UniProtKB/Swiss-Prot annotation:
Lineage per the UniProt record: Bacteria, Pseudomonadati, Pseudomonadota, Gammaproteobacteria, Cellvibrionales
Protein's job: Required for the formation of a threonylcarbamoyl group on adenosine at position 37 (t(6)A37) in tRNAs that read codons beginning with adenine. Is involved in the transfer of the threonylcarbamoyl moiety of threonylcarbamoyl-AMP (TC-AMP) to the N6 group of A37, together with TsaE and TsaB. TsaD likely plays a direct catalytic role in this reaction.
PANTHER family: TRNA N6-ADENOSINE THREONYLCARBAMOYLTRANSFERASE, TRNA N6-ADENOSINE THREONYLCARBAMOYLTRANSFERASE, MITOCHONDRIAL
Cofactor notes: Binds 1 Fe(2+) ion per subunit.
Subcellular location per the Swiss-Prot or TrEMBL entry: Cytoplasm
Source organism of the structure: Cellvibrio japonicus (strain Ueda107)
Keywords attached to this entry: Acyltransferase, Cytoplasm, Iron, Metal-binding, Transferase, tRNA processing
Gene: tsaD
Protein name stated in the entry: tRNA N6-adenosine threonylcarbamoyltransferase
Primary site of residence: cytoplasm
Catalyzed reactions: L-threonylcarbamoyladenylate + adenosine(37) in tRNA = N(6)-L-threonylcarbamoyladenosine(37) in tRNA + AMP + H(+)
Record-linked InterPro entries: ATPase_NBD, Gcp-like_dom, KAE1/TsaD, Peptidase_M22_CS, TsaD
Amino acid sequence: MRVLGLETSCDETGVAVYDSAQGLLAHRLYSQVKLHAEYGGVVPELASRDHVRKLLPLIDEVMAASGSTAADIDAIAYTAGPGLIGALMVGAAFGRSLAYAWGIPAVGVHHMEGHLLAPMLEAVPPEFPFVALLVSGGHTQLVKVMAIGDYELLGESIDDAAGEAFDKAAKMLDLDYPGGPQIARLAEQGVHGRFKFPRPMVDRPGLAFSFSGLKTATLTAVNAHKQANGLPDDQTCADIACAFQEAVVDTLVIKCRRALEQTGMKTLVIAGGVSANKKLRADLEVELARIGARVFYARHEFCTDNGAMIAYAGCQRLLAGQQEGLAIHVKARWPLNSLSSL
């Protein structure tokens, strides 16, 4: 089965062609970072309009790159949620309309299921069952994964997602949007130990996360330095970024190890934008090796939103016989554990 995948849940337009026999044939991604940078964050209406402009040219490009014609495509998969409702509607309406015109089925894909399954596109994919850490700007969740669609939520953030905390800490340090990668780069120049921030909720049983207190601690450190010494210099900003990143990564690593120990599993999958963080990957590999566990993740280009993960996830559901009517349904909020198993 050959599937055209469309991703438009937020500020990236992703298109890909995946073939169940040949694997990923082609993918393209257009990022709206420059469009939203002057506003310091994503403007939903601008995101929707830019998806309208970019989607068709990207489809043409991917179809050509994959050597596919309309007759070669067996189905279309599009992101149906969660995400920005207007952006989702662009991809859903386009995907449904194109599928109707080509006389093929279309299926709506859960955005976070796409992220969760992105490591399956690697040469050495993880095997079920495993624990997944979904960590992005909108989600921080630990999920027990028995099979595609068989998900049990083990714990999640009770306030901000880790990626959102990265972005807000970056604003405190007057870094450019998007903040997460900026914090990570700046942290590499920081001095370890100059600032110390809490590891939220690691002293409590359970697998819930909280990052609002860490944001407050970071803001307090920035303001205290301003009052005593004026605006932080470059080295001070790097030291704060280093301490902040260490606190987030330590918290995630501790909870991931705890989740594996509680479930008795030996495989962890990390997915979502924050899974591209080099320190998170390195620290997880070291910590999990101590308990004989392994960590899997997607290549960097598939950590952020992309069409390849949507094409793959949609293909698996279509191969399992999932069918949908012609009505367009998208959801700004959509619990992962509400999905049907295959």
